[in-house]
């Protein structure tokens, strides 16, 4: 436990030092910053804010977790595969950000390219991580999927990777939402005695907390796709490594809600010839523009943050209660 906590503290302190240096480099190099949604007027002032900050906490967390696990004899197959997903999905996000920022390609990687790379990572993860006989845990009950587990694994990894990416649209929202989710999985890992996975979790929590100091409103830096895609893949990988896949539907309710809002909006728009359910999706923008109903007073980014963080925290506590108190 001491090693895991130490990894988190080291990552936190390193990120505190590295992020300001990253921002300074970004400014001096006159790199074009984040582009903003035209429909959210209050975001226009953020245009040009340095992005790709996720590269800093991602590299730092992965290296700290790797070396701490290695030198404490806690490096396992599961740790290796979680770090692999972080690196590969982070690379996908980096390529996406790179094309947007340096090549001026607004959409970055096209959907097919992004999906292909995410699926590749999922296949490799499936082949090497300790699966326990391709058993899917559904509310604590084992379901033997056999070969079909690979399809679930791919759906889980790609789905939650993109879901966290959609959540990253308000200052600080994604970073603390993931901290809350990882904290819940940290408890599960501790109870299961999987200290190797706990080490990786605490290392990333440390990095995210250090990053949040510069990412809360008004954000001085954004994580970019390099951070959000990696974090979503990490959550999915951890849920599978702990054999508690179903828990991510509750622990990750914020990401599920954000993604579902986009799917509902697109489907309803097509079916009705242009009508909308929400003022704007992902749904955090709906709250920004008109509060909970979409027709009231706009919510500040802090209010949106605390609403979603509160939902995520309650969902995480509910999950732990279901697992250990019922």
Swiss-Prot record:
Residue stretches spanning the membrane: 3-23, 51-71, 79-99, 115-135, 138-158, 169-189, 195-215, 221-243, 306-326
Subcellular location: Cell membrane
Pfam families found in the cross-reference section: Glycos_transf_4 (PF00953), MraY_sig1 (PF10555)
Recorded GO MF terms: metal ion binding; phospho-N-acetylmuramoyl-pentapeptide-transferase activity
Highest rank taxon of the organism: Bacteria
E.C. number(s) listed in UniProt: 2.7.8.13
InterPro entries referenced in this protein's UniProt entry, alphabetically: Glycosyl_transferase_4, PNAcMuramoyl-5peptid_Trfase, PNAcMuramoyl-5peptid_Trfase_CS
Pathway of action: Cell wall biogenesis; peptidoglycan biosynthesis
Name under which the protein is recorded: Phospho-N-acetylmuramoyl-pentapeptide-transferase
């Amino acid at each position: 436990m001491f090693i895991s906590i130490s990894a988190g503290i080291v990552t936190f302190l390193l990120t505190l030092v590295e992020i300001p240096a990253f921002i300074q480099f970004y400014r001096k190099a006159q790199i074009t910053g984040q582009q903003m949604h035209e429909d959210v007027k209050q975001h226009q002032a953020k245009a040009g804010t340095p992005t790709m900050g996720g590269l800093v906490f991602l590299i730092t967390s992965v290296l700290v977790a790797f070396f701490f696990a290695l030198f404490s004899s806690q490096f396992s197959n599961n740790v290796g595969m979680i770090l692999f997903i972080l690196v590969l999905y982070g690379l996908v996000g980096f390529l996406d950000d790179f094309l947007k920022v340096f090549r001026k390609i607004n959409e970055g990687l096209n959907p097919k390219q992004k999906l292909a790379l995410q699926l590749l990572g999922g296949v490799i993860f499936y082949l090497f991580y300790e699966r326990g006989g391709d058993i899917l845990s559904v509310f604590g009950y084992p379901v033997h999927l056999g070969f079909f587990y690979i399809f679930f694994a791919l759906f889980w990894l790609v789905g939650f990777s993109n879901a966290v990416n959609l959540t990253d649209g308000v200052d600080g929202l994604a970073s603390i939402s993931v901290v809350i989710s990882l904290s819940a999985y940290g408890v599960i890992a501790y109870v299961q005695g999987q200290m190797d996975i706990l080490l990786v979790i605490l290392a990333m929590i440390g990095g995210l907390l250090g990053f949040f100091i510069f990412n809360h409103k008004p954000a001085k830096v954004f994580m970019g796709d390099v951070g959000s895609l990696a974090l979503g893949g990490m959550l999915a990988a951890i849920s599978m490594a702990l054999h508690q896949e179903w828990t991510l539907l509750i622990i990750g309710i914020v990401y599920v809600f954000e993604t579902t809002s986009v799917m509902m909006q697109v489907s309803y728009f097509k079916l009705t010839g242009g009508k909308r359910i929400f003022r704007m999706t992902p749904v955090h923008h709906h709250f920004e523009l008109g509060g909970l109903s979409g027709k009231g007073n706009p919510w500040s980014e802090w209010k949106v943050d605390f609403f979603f963080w509160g939902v995520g925290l309650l969902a995480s506590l509910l999950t732990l209660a279901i697992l250990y108190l019922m």
